[in-house]
């Protein structure tokens, strides 16, 4: 599954119903504007807070091993929500270790978070593969 995020309840209920059948969900954390976190505050796309708050919501329905974060690989790959690979890595740190968070802090640490994906490999290539090179290297050193 690669759902866009604006209708949390619909997608997450489907994911919950499918349960262990799902291998991985890479939710699209871009092209969505601002959205609320579990704490009731709104977070703007294109920030570490948005990524961690929305992933934290998904992680209330699925196991960390089923969840990846999906982001555009370059500024041209999406209408909004692009972040540099360093922000993606900070979100991964926040979600897995509770460090490098912004103002939003997840309700738990998820060390077995599945990973990240970019939209798309073609956009990443046009941007010097900066997403895949940086995020892949960072995922490799995260504690499991």
Model-inferred region functions:
Residues 1-144:
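Secreted glycan hydrolases and related glycan-binding modules that recognize and/or cleave
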């Amino acid at each position: 599954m690669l759902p866009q995020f604006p209708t949390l309840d619909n997608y997450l209920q489907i994911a919950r119903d499918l349960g262990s059948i799902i291998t991985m969900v890479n939710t699209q954390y871009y092209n969505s504007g601002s959205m609320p976190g579990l704490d009731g505050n709104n977070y703007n796309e294109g920030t570490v807070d948005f990524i961690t708050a929305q992933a934290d919501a998904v992680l209330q329905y699925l196991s960390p091993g089923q969840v990846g974060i999906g982001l555009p690989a370059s500024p041209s790959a999406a209408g909004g929500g692009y972040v540099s690979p360093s922000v993606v890595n900070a979100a991964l740190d926040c979600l897995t270790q509770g460090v490098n968070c912004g103002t939003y802090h997840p309700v738990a640490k998820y060390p077995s978070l599945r990973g990240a994906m970019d939209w798309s490999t073609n956009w990443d290539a046009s941007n010097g593969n900066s997403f895949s090179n940086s995020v892949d290297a960072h995922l490799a050193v995260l504690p499991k």
